[in-house]
């Protein structure tokens, strides 16, 4: 009986050891895979895209409200000022609560393209700048961070402009008379319809302010996030999580301040369609700036700053927090 018990214990021990070895081999294999050159190069882009898509899913209703506020009172200096609550009430009253998520498919595609490229390029640029600075016995400063943010934002915005355009068209479609609405079913439907009816080049309508907005946004978001985090780490005893959240909020404010005028113009240009006379309301970014300033006043560019910040800051916080977490998981 004793020998049978010993045999059973030995067999159990062998099974446990085998399971441990298999688990260790699996973890090692996964770790080795994550550290292959191709995967290491791709991870910043993958993590960036995933983090942006998570943030967009959370923030989409606020983005919808922001766009409607920017399009309200076009061409008029006076009139009632729309409020976030009023816009929300109007959207729900004209349809259903889920209408606040109109354009989500376009928003997710935009993040899959834009944020993947933006954060991926920024991380790649920063890695190279850090390596170069290390060789010289120096550290990466604010100027280098800002340059990396500007370059990454501009490049990513140009690539992601079609998805951005589709998002604005889907979100503004409900403002048109019922007979003139396109009733896009998805981002693919929107992109296909725009390309067929207006030409492929129309997918890059508003590209100039989109690029400038992205550069301004990244200058505020990525550069100030890195700088704020470095300053908070040096000057406070806060936990890493509190420092990250605080740096995200600071970065979101500067990102909003620098980018809102360009976001406003981008929305107007991407929403516009040709009238009965075949002409567009605006001829380009400069013309849009000039007409809005003359007809509606310069402060119109900052209308809805609070809503924009509430959209930008949490989006920045969620994006950067998820990106940091994914970076920690895959380091």
Curated annotation (Swiss-Prot):
The chain crosses the membrane at residues 42-62, 103-121, 148-168, 199-219, 245-265, 309-329. It is found in: Mitochondrion inner membrane. GO terms for cellular component: mitochondrial inner membrane. Solcar repeats lie at residues 39-128, 140-231, 239-329. SUPFAM superfamilies: Mitochondrial carrier. Keywords: Membrane, Mitochondrion, Mitochondrion inner membrane, Repeat, Transmembrane, Transmembrane helix, Transport. This is Putative mitochondrial 2-oxoglutarate/malate carrier protein. It comes from Neurospora crassa (strain ATCC 24698 / 74-OR23-1A / CBS 708.71 / DSM 1257 / FGSC 987). The lineage of its organism: Eukaryota, Fungi, Dikarya, Ascomycota, Pezizomycotina. The gene is mic-33.
């Amino acid at each position: 009986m004793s020998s049978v018990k010993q045999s059973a214990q030995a067999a159990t021990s062998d099974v446990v050891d085998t399971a441990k070895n298999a688990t260790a081999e699996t973890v090692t294999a996964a770790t080795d895979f994550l550290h292959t050159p191709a995967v290491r190069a791709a991870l910043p882009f993958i993590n960036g895209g995933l983090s942006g898509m998570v943030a967009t899913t959370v923030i989409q209703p606020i983005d919808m409200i922001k766009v409607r506020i920017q399009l309200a009172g076009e061409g008029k200096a006076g009139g009632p000022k729309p409020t976030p609550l009023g816009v929300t009430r109007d959207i729900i009253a004209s349809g259903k609560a889920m209408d606040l998520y109109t354009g989500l498919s376009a928003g997710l595609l935009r993040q899959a393209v834009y944020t993947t490229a933006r954060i991926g390029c920024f991380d790649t640029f920063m890695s190279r700048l850090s390596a170069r600075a290390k060789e010289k016995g120096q550290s990466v400063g604010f100027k280098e961070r800002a340059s990396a943010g500007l370059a990454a934002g501009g490049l990513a915005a140009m690539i992601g402009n079609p998805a951005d355009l589709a998002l604005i068209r889907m979100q503004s479609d409900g403002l048109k008379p019922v007979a003139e609405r396109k009733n896009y079913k998805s981002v693919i439907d929107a992109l296909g319809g725009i390309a067929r009816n207006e030409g492929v080049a129309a997918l890059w309508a508003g590209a100039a302010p989109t690029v400038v907005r992205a550069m301004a946004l990244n200058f505020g978001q990525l550069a100030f996030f890195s700088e704020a985090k470095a300053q908070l780490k040096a000057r406070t005893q806060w936990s890493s999580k509190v420092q990250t959240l605080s740096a995200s909020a600071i970065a979101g404010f500067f990102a909003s301040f620098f980018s809102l005028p360009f976001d406003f113009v981008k929305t107007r240009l991407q929403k516009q369609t040709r009238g009965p006379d075949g002409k567009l309301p605006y001829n380009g970014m400069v013309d849009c700036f000039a007409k809005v300033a003359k007809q509606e006043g310069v402060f119109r560019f900052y209308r809805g700053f609070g809503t924009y910040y509430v959209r930008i800051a949490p989006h920045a916080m969620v994006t950067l927090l998820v990106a940091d977490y994914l970076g920690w998981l895959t380091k």
